[in-house]
C-alpha cells in the first residue's frame, strides 16, 4: 500500500510566537510533505477590530460561516486536495482551524489535534464538526474514553504534547531559592491562587512568589513587595525561573495541554497541582503532588514541600516520554498509517 503524504495546517498563538512553547513546533519534528501556514490569517483574526465597517463585515461573516473572517487558507487546501487523494491533513489546532464544512479536503483525510476538554468544545459548538474528522488526536489521556463515546467512531487516540528538552533542562550555573512559581493562563484559577499566595506570604517571611502569565490576570493578585507579576519574558528568563524555584504551583480549573507542566518537569521542578480533578497531570504521582482546591490544604502542602535540589528522575521521565523527538516520531507514524 502506498504511503500517504502528510500536510501541516497550523499557526502559532500570539503568546507562543518566537518562543519554545506551542504545539505548532511539531512541524520541526514531523517530516511533513506539505506546509499550510495559516499565521497571517490568525494574526488578523485575533486582532481587535475598531473600524465600524470591519466590525459589520465580521458580524456578517460570523452569521454565514461561523467565523469573522473568511478562512482563505481553505482555498489552498481545497486546491491541493482537488487533484490528489493521498493526503492526510493534520489540523494542529483544530478548535480554531477545522471548520463545520470539512468537505474542502476532497477525498483526502483529516486528522484533528484537540487541546481543550470536551465541555469547552461543547460550549464552542465544536463537537459536531469534529465528528466529521477521520481521526482525532487528544493531547491529554483523561477524556479518551469520553471522546470516543461522544464522537462514536472509535477514532480518537492519545498522543501527548511535546516539550523542547534540549532547551528545558537543569543547569549547574543556576541555584535554587525559596521561590514559589506559577506559570500560565488558560484554565488557571487566579482567584484561588491569590488566596494561597497571601496566606503563604503571611506565614513565610522569606518566601518570594513569581507569577508569569498574561497581563489580563494581574488584577487578580493583591499587591505585595514579595509577589512579582511578569508577562512577555524571554524563554531564557522563564527557564531560569523554573530552575531557581523551590516549588512550581499550578492552580488548575480543568486539564488541558500544559506547556508549563512539561517545561517545569523537564527542568526537574518540584511540582504541586491544586485541582478538583485528580487526572490533571501528565506525570505519575511519584513525580508530582496533587491536592484539592482547598486553601488550607494547598498552603500546608506547599509549606511542607519546598525542594532545593532538582528532581532528576522527573527530568529523565519527561525526556523519555515527552521530548519533541519522541512525540514527532509517534505523530508522524500515526499520520502515515492511514
Task: Please state what every model-predicted region is.
Residues 91-97:
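Short His-centered aromatic/hydrophobic patch
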Residues 133-155, 218, 331:
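A short, active-site helix/loop in glycosyltransferases that binds the activated sugar's phosphate group
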Residues 145, 157-177, 338:
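Acidic anion/phosphate-binding donor-loop and adjacent secondary structure
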Residues 172-198:
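Conserved donor-binding/catalytic core segment of Leloir-type glycosyltransferases
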Residues 215-239:
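Nucleotide-activated donor-binding/catalytic signature segment of Leloir-type glycosyltransferases, i.e.
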Residues 243-256, 269-270:
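Acidic donor-binding loop of glycosyltransferase active sites
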Residues 285-296, 301-307:
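Conserved acidic donor-binding segment of nucleotide-sugar-dependent glycosyltransferases
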Residues 293, 306-337:
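A charged, aromatic-enriched C-terminal amphipathic alpha-helix characteristic of glycosyltransferases
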Amino acid at each position: 500500500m502506498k504511503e500517504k503524504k502528510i500536510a501541516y495546517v497550523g499557526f502559532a498563538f500570539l503568546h507562543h510566537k518566537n518562543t519554545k512553547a506551542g504545539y505548532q513546533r511539531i512541524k520541526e519534528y514531523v517530516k511533513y510533505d506539505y506546509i499550510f501556514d495559516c499565521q497571517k490569517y490568525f494574526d488578523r483574526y485575533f486582532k481587535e477590530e475598531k473600524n465600524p465597517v470591519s466590525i459589520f463585515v465580521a458580524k456578517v461573516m460570523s452569521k454565514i460561516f461561523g467565523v469573522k473572517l473568511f478562512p482563505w487558507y481553505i482555498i489552498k487546501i481545497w486546491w491541493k486536495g482537488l487533484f490528489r487523494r493521498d493526503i492526510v491533513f493534520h489540523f494542529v489546532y483544530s478548535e480554531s482551524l477545522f471548520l463545520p464544512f470539512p468537505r474542502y479536503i476532497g477525498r483526502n483525510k483529516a486528522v484533528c489535534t484537540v487541546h481543550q476538554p470536551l465541555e469547552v468544545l461543547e460550549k464552542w459548538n465544536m463537537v459536531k464538526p469534529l465528528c466529521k474528522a477521520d481521526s482525532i488526536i487528544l493531547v491529554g489521556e483523561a477524556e479518551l474514553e469520553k471522546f470516543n463515546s461522544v464522537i462514536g467512531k472509535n477514532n480518537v487516540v492519545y498522543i501527548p504534547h511535546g516539550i523542547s528538552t534540549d532547551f528545558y533542562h537543569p543547569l549547574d550555573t543556576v541555584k535554587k531559592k525559596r521561590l514559589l512559581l506559577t506559570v500560565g493562563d488558560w484554565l488557571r484559577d487566579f482567584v484561588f491562587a491569590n488566596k494561597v499566595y497571601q496566606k503563604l506570604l503571611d506565614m513565610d517571611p522569606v518566601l518570594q512568589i513569581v507569577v508569569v502569565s498574561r497581563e489580563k490576570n494581574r488584577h487578580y493578585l493583591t499587591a505585595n513587595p514579595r509577589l512579582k507579576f511578569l508577562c512577555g519574558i524571554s524563554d531564557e528568563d522563564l527557564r531560569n525561573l523554573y530552575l531557581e524555584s523551590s516549588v512550581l504551583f499550578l492552580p488548575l480549573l480543568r486539564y488541558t495541554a500544559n506547556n508549563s507542566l512539561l517545561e517545569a518537569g523537564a527542568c526537574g521542578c518540584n511540582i504541586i497541582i491544586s485541582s478538583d480533578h485528580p487526572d490533571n497531570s501528565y506525570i505519575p504521582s511519584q513525580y508530582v503532588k496533587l491536592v484539592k482546591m482547598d486553601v488550607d490544604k494547598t498552603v500546608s502542602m506547599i509549606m511542607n514541600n519546598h525542594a532545593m535540589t532538582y528532581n532528576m528522575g522527573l527530568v529523565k521521565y519527561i525526556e523519555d516520554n515527552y521530548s519533541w523527538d519522541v512525540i514527532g516520531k509517534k505523530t508522524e507514524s500515526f499520520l502515515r498509517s492511514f
